[in-house]
């Protein structure tokens, strides 16, 4: 079995909606393979939301004008194409814009329903004079990529409904480059740098995660042809390797009190991995292993970033009965001659 070093992915935020992602080290050639796939997926396949059609009060078609409005309908449509929205609704959703002049009309004047959010409230849509009045019904749908107005036009749609081009993609720009990087004595490994800029409706981090999920699903189709086919296995991450090392440690490394240590040993628990596979209820079933011992174990595990099976997160060691550091604290290996000296089988907490 061939095992490659696991690459790391690090995000370097440049601004709120632009980040640079560095993936390294990659086997020679994989930088361009991943970079091209990620770029194409980010630009074309990230789900988003957009306005698909509008209906303006008193307007029958897109070549009309609206009394009291400086912009004609064509200009209004061009401005609405710049609107940045997000939607949690799978079905088409309607939102409304109603404004009386004089003054400017911006995206902040739109009243979105529940599940829809306007992310570009400062976008200028139109200008009204003293007698100007604008009422627009906007239909928002979810999708991906680009859909033309002709494709958005539905058979038998109502008179006055104007379909518009929809740009669903929340990603504005993606570039990548591949550099050489060194691993031990080899200098031909790849470092992939992907620069992602998005609209305010999604963060670059979420866009990158979405692209990765899509690619994993698609490449998984090839793996299904033969699940046992040999490939290059990716080694464990540094965090996984450190966790595996901690789990393999003997419980002697926890520096427990004599009573807790002896109880665990008699139960056949020899490593930290075996210990964290037990729940509090399992440990309380051990004879002479009471709540003080539970608190001690949880405190020691918490210092290592671990916890017992099914334990709720957020254990506060200060809530435990604090006997550590006092005269009654007796680490199991502080003095071998005292091992078990104070351990009484029948004593209960």
Swiss-Prot record:
Keywords: DNA-directed RNA polymerase, Nucleotidyltransferase, Transcription, Transferase. GO terms for molecular function: DNA binding; DNA-directed RNA polymerase activity; protein dimerization activity. It holds the Pfam family RNA_pol_A_bac. GO terms for biological process: DNA-templated transcription. The keyword Nucleotidyltransferase applies. Residues 1-226 are annotated as: Alpha N-terminal domain (alpha-NTD). The N-terminal domain is essential for RNAP assembly and basal transcription, whereas the C-terminal domain is involved in interaction with transcriptional regulators and with upstream promoter elements. DNA-dependent RNA polymerase catalyzes the transcription of DNA into RNA using the four ribonucleoside triphosphates as substrates. This is DNA-directed RNA polymerase subunit alpha.
């Amino acid at each position: 079995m061939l095992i490659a070093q696991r690459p790391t992915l690090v995000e370097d935020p440049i601004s709120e909606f632009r980040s640079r992602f560095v993936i390294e080290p990659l086997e020679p050639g994989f930088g361009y393979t991943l970079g091209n796939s990620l770029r194409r997926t980010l630009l074309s396949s990230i789900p988003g939301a957009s306005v698909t059609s509008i209906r303006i009060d008193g307007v029958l078609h897109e070549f009309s004008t609206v009394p009291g409005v400086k912009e004609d309908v064509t200009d209004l449509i061009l401005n609405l194409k710049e609107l940045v929205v997000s939607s949690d609704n799978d079905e088409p959703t309607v939102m409304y814009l109603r404004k009386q002049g004089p003054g400017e009309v911006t995206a902040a004047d739109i009243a979105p329903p529940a599940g829809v959010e306007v992310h570009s409230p400062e976008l200028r849509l139109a200008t009204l004079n003293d007698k100007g009045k604008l009422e627009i019904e906007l239909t928002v749908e979810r999708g991906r990529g680009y859909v033309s107005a002709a494709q958005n036009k539905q058979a038998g749609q109502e008179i006055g409904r104007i379909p518009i081009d929809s740009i669903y993609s929340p990603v504005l720009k993606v570039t990548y480059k591949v550099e050489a990087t060194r691993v031990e004595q080899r200098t031909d490994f790849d470092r992939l740098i992907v620069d992602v800029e998005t609209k305010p409706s999604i963060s670059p981090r979420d866009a990158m995660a979405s692209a990765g999920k899509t690619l994993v699903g698609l490449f998984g189709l090839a793996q299904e042809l033969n699940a046992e086919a040999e490939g290059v296995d990716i080694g464990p991450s540094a965090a996984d390797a450190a966790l595996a090392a901690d789990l393999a440690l003997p419980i002697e490394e926890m520096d427990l009190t004599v009573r807790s240590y002896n109880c665990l040993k008699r139960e056949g628990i020899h490593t930290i991995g075996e210990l964290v596979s037990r729940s509090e209820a399992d440990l309380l079933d051990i004879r002479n292993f009471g709540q003080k011992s539970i608190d001690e174990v949880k405190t020691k595990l918490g210092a290592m970033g671990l916890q017992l099976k099914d334990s709720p997160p957020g254990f506060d060691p200060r809530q435990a009965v604090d006997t550590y550091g006092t005269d009654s604290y007796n680490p199991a290996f502080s003095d071998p001659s005292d091992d078990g000296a104070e351990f009484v089988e029948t004593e209960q907490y």
